[in-house]
Amino acid sequence: MPKTFHRTDRVSAQLRRELGTLVHNAVREHGLPSVSVSDVEITRDMAHAKVFVTALMPERSAEAVAGLKELGYRLRMDLARAMKLRHVPELHFHYDDSVDRGEHIDNILRDLPDTLAAEKRRESDEE
């Protein structure tokens, strides 16, 4: 059975594409820390959109999100010009920490063989 696509899914994908370009330009123009749009979730009534961004430097993510929140109105107006929507949703920017969590898990898994080898050595020394 084919998957049904709702209008909100299509609008969300289009918002993600457009915002990716707009956010990239805003970062360059306003000297914000480098971020990229990772996902956009839009409400069913299309009045609000959660925009998830990832930062190249996670330690400056709060600064980047705060800067984007300040530019939210301008970005919304730019979206209105770029998209053919009757009502452009209000933008709410959030930091997406999934990349950071994935990197943390990757580091744990990478260190696992060393940890297991050290534990085996400790067990053999005790015997």
Swiss-Prot record:
Cellular localisation: Cytoplasm
Disulfide bond sites: none
GO biological process: maturation of SSU-rRNA
Keyword Transport in record: no
Keywords, ordered alphabetically: Cytoplasm, Ribosome biogenesis
Key word Cytoplasm present: yes
GO MF entries: ribosomal small subunit binding
Domain of life: Bacteria
GO cellular component: a single term: cytosol
InterPro entries membership: KH_dom-like_a/b, RbfA, RbfA_dom_sf, Ribosome-bd_factorA_CS
Function description: One of several proteins that assist in the late maturation steps of the functional core of the 30S ribosomal subunit. Associates with free 30S ribosomal subunits (but not with 30S subunits that are part of 70S ribosomes or polysomes). Required for efficient processing of 16S rRNA. May interact with the 5'-terminal helix region of 16S rRNA.
Family that this chain belongs to: Belongs to the RbfA family.
Subunit note: Monomer. Binds 30S ribosomal subunits, but not 50S ribosomal subunits or 70S ribosomes.
The protein, known as: Ribosome-binding factor A
Organism of provenance: Stenotrophomonas maltophilia (strain K279a)
